């Protein structure tokens, strides 16, 4: 086995989601200590994603008994569209907080980033599909219809499940 460590210079990188060989494993800053990434020797496809940024992908050759560090650098996506002044606010109260959050099938961050007293996401008014998923837990899905300026909250506690139940969004970046 070889260890893969991640280095991110800014909060953007540290809050980005990580996929290894097409499987979501968590967000960058948590992948250490008891959640450190140990991989079988060989080539592995690493993907890092964050809303509003271009996907970062790299193939890593993992050698047995070694520690590899991947420096992650996210760059803004000029095609990203952000809500205007009529945006609605959606707060997520989700357990576990490390679960991946998808809005309209696009990864937007981990659940802990959109909950608590000061955290939420801004969405354009209208209908949106919200999906919260984490390997080893059952996926939560709901649809929200938001009005301009509306404040809403979604609460969910993901029940334990099997890795076999992981949705395609969790399996493929």
What is each of the regions a protein language model found here?
Residues 1-173:
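Short loop/turn and low-complexity linker motifs enriched in small/turn-promoting residues
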């Amino acid at each position: 086995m070889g260890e893969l460590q991640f280095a991110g210079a800014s909060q953007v990188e540290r809050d980005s989601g990580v996929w290894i060989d097409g499987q979501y494993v968590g967000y960058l800053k948590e992948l250490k200590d008891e959640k450190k990434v140990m991989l079988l020797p060989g080539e592995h496809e690493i993907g890092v994603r964050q809303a509003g940024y271009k996907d970062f992908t790299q193939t890593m050759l993992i050698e047995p008994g070694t520690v590899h560090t991947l420096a992650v650098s996210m760059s803004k996506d000029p095609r990203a569209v952000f809500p205007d002044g009529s945006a609605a606010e959606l707060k997520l109260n989700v357990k576990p907080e490390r679960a991946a959050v998808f809005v309209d099938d696009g990864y937007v961050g981990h659940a802990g980033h959109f909950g608590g007293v000061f955290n939420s996401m801004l969405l354009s008014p209208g209908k949106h599909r919200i999906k919260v998923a984490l390997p080893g837990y059952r996926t939560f899905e709901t649809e929200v219809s938001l009005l301009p300026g509306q404040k809403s909250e979604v609460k969910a506690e993901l029940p334990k499940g099997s890795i076999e139940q992981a949705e395609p969004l969790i399996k493929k970046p």
